[in-house]
Amino acid sequence: MKIGIIGAMEPEVAHLIAAMTNATSQTIAGIEFIAGTLAGKDVVVTRSGIGKVAASIATTLLIEKYAPDAVINTGSAGGFVDTLAIGDIVISSEVRHHDVDVTAFGYEIGQMAQQPAAFVPAAHLVEAANKAIAQLGEVKAIEGLICTGDSFICDPIRTQAMLKNFPTMAACEMEGAAIAQVCHQFGVPFVVIRSLSDNANNDSPVDFDSYIVKAGYHSALMVMLLLEQLNPSAIK
């Protein structure tokens, strides 16, 4: 069993890479892929870069070159749930694009043409994540809708517009749905796990800079605990 792990930024993958053993590195198209062992599993970790195009390129290369049995997207996100604090975690129940609109052709808001409206993570990955929650200590984790777009959301007016379109949205970020769409295309199971770095409001730029390391650590911890819970026989 081999697991691909993708984070957009250095703080989102640094703790994972530091915990790996037997690590080897290969750079393809300017993207570094680090293969090794983490939490007893064979993994390939990569820093994709920020945004949907960068994430799509990295995910495609990861799948084509390393053939992972599953892909985990880790990192930070803006939060939309009042009961969650900065550093808490959202496990994807589904992932959607929040900045796609081809409704003129009969699609749902957020649904790309010829794609599903929502990308649903693999049940065995979500199950492993939920089993790991008990080991997080004071960090809270929930399942919820994660939305993706090529914007850093810090405008309350835009936040309200997004919630009108996606009232159950728990978090937003800039890569997850792109990674999920590539995994869907290749038939590779995925899950998105995000720790909150901000609350998608006017304070978000300051909060993000202050808390990205904390969010990256919590998300990485969740990934490692998930890997420990993951049953190789569950991989499909």
Swiss-Prot record:
SUPFAM superfamilies named in the record: Purine and uridine phosphorylases
Pathway the protein contributes to: Amino-acid biosynthesis; L-methionine biosynthesis via salvage pathway; S-methyl-5-thio-alpha-D-ribose 1-phosphate from S-methyl-5'-thioadenosine (hydrolase route): step 1/2
Enzyme class (EC, first level): hydrolase
One GO CC annotation: cytosol
UniProt xrefs under Pfam families: PNP_UDP_1
An annotated Gene Ontology molecular function: methylthioadenosine nucleosidase activity
Record-linked InterPro entries: MTA_SAH_Nsdase, Nucleoside_phosphorylase_d, Nucleoside_phosphorylase_sf
Gene3D superfamilies: Nucleoside phosphorylase domain (3.40.50.1580)
Similarity annotation: Belongs to the PNP/UDP phosphorylase family. MtnN subfamily.
Protein name: 5'-methylthioadenosine/S-adenosylhomocysteine nucleosidase
Organism: Shewanella baltica (strain OS185)
